[in-house]
Amino acid sequence: MAVPKKRKSKMKTRLRKAQWKSEASREAAKALSKAKTVIKSLLAANSANLESNSENSN
């Protein structure tokens, strides 16, 4: 005869969900920080190239 599964408590479910969300939030913050670093380095390299090109043309 089929027996229903034992239910997990809401507290355990909420704790697991909160843990997952906090880890995801940390990873998202890391990814954003890395993206900002890459963009800053690209902008710095681009501005350096523009300055050297303007000096060479003068």
Curated annotation (Swiss-Prot):
InterPro entries: Ribosomal_bL32, Ribosomal_zn-bd. It is found in: Plastid, Chloroplast. The keyword Plastid applies. SUPFAM superfamilies: Zn-binding ribosomal proteins. GO terms for cellular component: chloroplast; large ribosomal subunit. Residues 1-19 have a biased composition (Basic residues). It holds the Pfam family Ribosomal_L32p. Residues 1-25 are annotated as: Disordered. Keywords: Chloroplast, Plastid, Ribonucleoprotein, Ribosomal protein. It comes from the Eukaryota. One of its GO terms (biological process) is translation. One of its GO terms (molecular function) is structural constituent of ribosome. Signal peptide: none annotated. Belongs to the bacterial ribosomal protein bL32 family. This is Large ribosomal subunit protein bL32c. It comes from Chlorella vulgaris. The gene is rpl32.
